[in-house]
Amino acid sequence: MHRFFYFLTFFFSITLLSHPNSSIEKYPDEMAHAPTPLPDRVVLTWNDDPATTQAVTWRTDTSIEVGLAQLAIANANGRALKPDEFKAETSYFESDINEAHYHSVTFKNLQPNTLYAYRVGDGVNWTEYYHFKTASSSEDPFSFIYFGDAQNEVRTHWSRVFREAFRDAPRAAFTLHAGDLIDEHNMDSQWGEWHQGPDWVNGTIPVIATPGNHEYQKDSETKRIWTNKDGQPINIEIESLNNDNPEIFIVDIEDFQNRTGTIKIKDSGEIIDADEGIELITGYKREELINKPILGGKAPLYDRLQNPDGIQKVSNHWRPQFSFPIQNVPDERLKETLYYLDYQGVRFISLDSNIEMEIQVDWLRKVLEENDNRWTIITFHHPLYSPASDRDNFEMRKLWKPLLDEFKVDLVLSGHDHTYSRTGLIDEKKVENIPTGYQQAYDPEIGTVHVVSVSGPKMYEITKGSYAKKLGENTQLYQIIDISKDNLRFRAYTATGKLYDEFLLKKRKDQPNLLIETGP
């Protein structure tokens, strides 16, 4: 008995000594990601011609009512800069944990292939000067970096992938993100982590992004809004619902700061019990909630759906923090998610694979018909060919693939499946256990290469990948794509910078692209 007691004492002593910071609590998200008068979340995007325009957005707290940007052609002596000043468009933004102002400026009438210096602020408090370079007006060679889903543990595990990619391609023209940049569409802390990963790089290398399913708000009975004691809305999610007793509902709750609680509600809607977790989440004491309704004018919590109309909507963060082209799209919800940009002989097209896929077909046909660029690259989140066991985007493939084939699109960049797969010429005798249509994933008479990739730590299992030339599981990746007049070189690297896959596409007159395997 004494020996067992001494063992326990020794074990707990060692445990306490091993964790000297065990009493330290997590720094609150609302403080870690709070806006200040100083600009943060500075991002370059394009909403027009990359050779003559450049858009920049940034965030401050609401005390900054007027945002300003200064711009000059860069020179070797910073003190000799004579910048022009531009007033930003400023909009109020309320997230789940804070209020902010977003500011946006589009610099216009710029000179092609020119290095500019700019900074943003309020006239007193300025950022450092950033550089950006406008696109050339000709088909000069360039490189860009492509990322699949970042999504989870973005600050912890995705940041290193982005930074390794930047080490390999510091002169990249832009970064391209194929959706699911974050996990919870409207969680400000997750968007804050996404900005922290690239940090200042987003302010000097522009961003192209297409939305994933996690950027979209969907109708869900589990995602709800309450009002806390201070009158502020709080987002919560119902983790479980136990109604073994038909007159009493036991509801387990988790908010977006990962705080949990349990509440008991009568079938009539009256609260009959609440634990300490509910007190922490709502700010109400238990006795303030007991016998109060959860619905109606006197309800302290006022439970309601986050998305009562059931219409899928892109994240509230998407449009204030990015400024993508607003083009003649067939549905208002597709603004800045369905768009195209031309960059030095390449047409880049973002399709929105989350909503209204059918009505995008006519828009896409027109964009492809009017395309006089030498190369065409399309990005959308959900892949036409999925290596994951429970996924097959048949309807999307039926709608979009005929157009990709007709116009011989060169490259399709996707995410969603948390794996790596890349199509190419394969031995058809080895193709098995795949859905109908996967046999034509790569057709040398068409030449389109489809890539699925993942940059974050969340991973899925490959169960039907025999259609692909190259596959990968449990590997965080980034891709560097080099484009010149007649060649497209594609390289995929692991998070540690090791070459994982490589191929070359060669343009041929009046023939499909020639695909040359050059990788390990």
What is the predicted role of each segment?
Residues 278-289:
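PAS/PAS-like sensory domain cap-loop motif
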Residues 104-107, 115-132, 192-232, 290, ...:
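Extended active-site neighborhood of metal-dependent phosphoesterases/phosphodiesterases
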Residues 105, 272-273:
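PAS-family sensory domains
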Residues 6-10, 14-146, 167-168, 225-228, ...:
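Acidic, histidine-bearing metal-coordination/catalytic regions of metal-dependent phosphoesterases
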Residues 269-272, 278:
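Conserved hydrophobic beta-strand signature of PAS-family and PAS-like sensory domains
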Residues 146-148, 174-180, 207-213, 351-352, ...:
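Active-site neighborhood of phospho(di)ester-bond hydrolases with catalytic His/Asp-centered motifs
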Residues 355, 371-412, 430-434:
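Active-site-proximal segments of metal-dependent phosphoesterases and phosphodiesterases across multiple
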Residues 279-280, 295-299:
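Sensory helix hotspots in PAS and closely related PAS-like folds
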